[in-house]
Amino acid sequence: MRHQRIFGATTPLLLGAALLFGGSSTAQAACGLQSADNKIKHVVHIQFDNVHLRRDNPNVPSDLEQMPNLLNFMQNNGTVSGNHFTPLISHTATDILTVLTGAYGDRMGVPVANSYGFFRNDGSVGFSSSFLYWTALAADGKPELLSENGKIFPAPWAPFTRAGCDVGAYSIANMEFESVPGDVRTVFGIGSPEDIAVSAALNLPRTAANAPARQAPSTDYLGIAVHCALGSPLCNNSHARADALPDEPGGYTGFSALFGNVNVAPVICAAAPAGCNGSGAVKDTDGGVIADPYGRPGFPNTFSPLAKQSLGYAATMLEAGIPVVYVYLADAHDRNPVPLDPTTNLPGAAHAFGAGEAEYVAQLKAYDVAFGKFFARLAADGINKDNTLFFVTADENDHFVGGPASPANCDGIHVPCTYAQIGEIDTFLDRLLLTQRNNTTPFDIHFDDAPTFYIHGNPGPQDPLTRTLERDVDALQVTNPITNRVEKLNVFMADRAEMTLLHMITSNPARSPSFTMFGNPDYFNETSSASTGLGHDCSQAPACVFEGPGFAWNHGDVQKQITRTWMGMVGPGVIHAGRDDRVFSDHTDLRPTMIALAGLKDDYAHDGRVLIEFLDDHALPKSLRRSENFIELAQVYKQLNAPLGSVGLDSLRLANRSILGDDAGYAKFLATIADITTQRDALAAEIKPLLEAAAFDNQPIKEQQEDQLVRRARAIIDRVADLAHDEHDHDHDRH
């Protein structure tokens, strides 16, 4: 869910410059994908937000079951896995950026989302959005996408554009503008005509009459981009700007891009007029103009595009000769669009649905219709499973917070479900700590069901201030307003040492939280403000625990219901396995698998690995064909290195128990987990180059190598498992 990213609305601007094409508008760059048999001509990446393969109510068909046009396309023509996992934390920005890069948050800079805290030099805490354009500086002054060497992490479009392939992006995290005016200034420059116009619109008084004008810059600039190959006619015009990637390995000069609908639509509508309305506005799959709530053509809303909008824009991009397209689709379990409030002229309050509610079912039906039209339209264009690689996934799944469905036999399709109680349970942690523990330690958190804590002054892990707050947070109990049961908020606590093992600590120490509470998934945890009882105990209004009906689907946490998601692949080189859950994978595996199938290569080693179990031998280099050595090493590597593999989950159990124990035991834990992490990282650093070389350099893994590395990995896995399950002496190491 991206409900944390609420942008100020904006105003109609400049921007109707005439096209100055240097070549034919229907031409395209010579895209040189190097797939097996040269069959792949297009790549379509579809990224869902919180759409489920599994059923949330056993009687109600799942989200994907209610989208048979998509589900059948994937299962009949490729492979769908429901044994696919997120990183930690399991929130939208981190999950999508992990998919796009094939790297965990410690390497690409954003392990906490959809915003994250950082410590200033004086020990105070600031916050930055996890959604900014790829090359933007975050609020801490460092690159948003901060690599392990302090540079901007390599961009996902660069291998494609270097191969001569234009890349389109629609609402996909950080590949296009995410914030105005900040991202406009990053690309166009402070004081540029674009910046002046956008800033003027955003600075208009916040009145109902000004709402359309204040929204216009978002409509014009957010959410849409085309990254062009060298010499692409799509960027040979006055709409293009330099596509600057100053830290890209090997250099990246001479490339251009189109940013925002105001610059993209004129170009793709000239190249593919059937996808537009004749006035330069792109149409959705139903034939309506894609527009904001006030009717202005462009990016439709604050990053919650409907299927018909995302797929309609994607189809027009493909028809305009853009062979690689990334698109994002909003979830279907929240009301979308939210009607405008007649008083403020702004979108009204959010509203969440439970499984099987009539409006939820209707929205899924609309998604299904959109996919049917999308696939039919592409097929008519000659874009299909025989020449196109389709990757589809969901950022994370969710835990539903609400009472039981009524009637008990409702299925949503024949009998609609209703819910007497629905909505996440919100808490004010600072007021609960004051009331129950008399703890007034100043801190900030990233609001979430798995909040990251930032203690003012940035005390160390063994500082009494930190140790006391961790124990007091663990001791908090609340009464669930839905069930009337008394419950703990904490489930697992992770300190900095454990977060390092879980790939949650970046190269900038200032971004390191004091600790993370992976909490009870029914609760969304916040801190209070002046209007919500700041400084007052829970005997005073407003309540410290209450049900919020706007949102009912929690994620960010560690529970399998949230972290176990799904992925689907269709296209040349993908086996037709249908539903196949035998292989554990996570989001880092999608990027290397896509790049390998396309015959390209990234400028860095992935944290994931190519999923050869789902690929045809003919699509693989000889080094991977029927390679049991690769498979055995890759599978044990995932259990060793993935946050939700064996080592990650077992170490989290160990960490929680140790953090909440006595100081002497905690000191022993710190030494033990540091040793485990050092050994794990060193072994992973040996394994990753072998997996990469086998996948991208045709260098087979030798059996002797594989046997030795697998034995070492299993020794670490077993060691952590023994420590995690040794309740009597968790510091005793049996190995």
Show where each model-derived region lies:
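Active-site His/acidic residue clusters
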Residues: 314, 319-366, 402-406
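A short beta-strand-to-alpha-helix junction
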Residues: 62-65, 87, 362-365, 423-427, ...
